[in-house]
């Protein structure tokens, strides 16, 4: 893993970095995380999140475009445990999470819009490894995502 460089330093040194709007909250036990993006586009159904977190993360970050839905949670404690067990660095969700007390105890970076007690649907639909856009940034599979106490940003796949 590359040494961690804070988002403030990256933003100053790399003006091409896409800095995300500060609309996501921190829910994970790890505040600082980084890695290559794996992307999903889903709508109020989380089987693709489960399937992805059950595969080796190899230090990557799962980026989920849930359409900004505030109707249900796309990640909870059980799926968070899969992320830790399989070596994921973090999960960024344009949607909601639940089981927030459990998520806070996990060694996993987690950003999401809000907490919601309702679970998602279980239809296996959505897209994987597609560009996703939310919070004012576009994330492509393989882009380098960096998150810390000051926010999160996206660098091209060739960046550290």
Curated annotation (Swiss-Prot):
Cofactor: a divalent metal cation
Catalytic activity: 4-hydroxy-4-methyl-2-oxoglutarate = 2 pyruvate; oxaloacetate + H(+) = pyruvate + CO2
Gene Ontology process terms (BP): regulation of RNA metabolic process
Chain positions recorded as a divalent metal cation binding sites: 99
GO MF annotations in UniProt: 4-hydroxy-4-methyl-2-oxoglutarate aldolase activity; metal ion binding; oxaloacetate decarboxylase activity; ribonuclease inhibitor activity
Classification via SUPFAM superfamilies: RraA-like
Comment on bound cofactor: Divalent metal cation.
Coiled coil segments of this chain: none
Residues reported in the UniProt entry to bind substrate: 76-79, 98
Protein name per its UniProtKB record: Putative 4-hydroxy-4-methyl-2-oxoglutarate aldolase
Organism annotation: Deinococcus radiodurans (strain ATCC 13939 / DSM 20539 / JCM 16871 / CCUG 27074 / LMG 4051 / NBRC 15346 / NCIMB 9279 / VKM B-1422 / R1)
């Amino acid at each position: 893993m590359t040494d961690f460089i804070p988002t403030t330093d990256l933003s100053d040194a790399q003006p091409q970095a896409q800095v995300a709007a500060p609309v996501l909250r921190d829910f994970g036990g790890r505040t600082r995380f980084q890695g290559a993006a794996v992307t999903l586009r889903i709508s109020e159904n989380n089987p693709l999140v489960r399937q992805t977190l059950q595969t080796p993360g190899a230090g990557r970050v799962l980026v989920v475009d849930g359409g900004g839905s505030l109707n249900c949670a796309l990640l909870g404690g059980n799926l968070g445990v899969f992320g830790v067990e399989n070596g994921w660095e973090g999960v960024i969700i344009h949607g909601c999470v639940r089981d927030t007390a459990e998520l806070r105890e996990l060694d996993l970076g987690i950003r999401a819009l809000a907490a919601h007690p309702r679970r998602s649907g279980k239809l296996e639909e959505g897209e994987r490894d597609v560009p996703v856009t939310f919070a004012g940034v576009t994330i492509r599979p393989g882009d380098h995502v960096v998150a810390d106490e000051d926010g999160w940003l996206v660098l091209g796949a060739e960046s550290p």
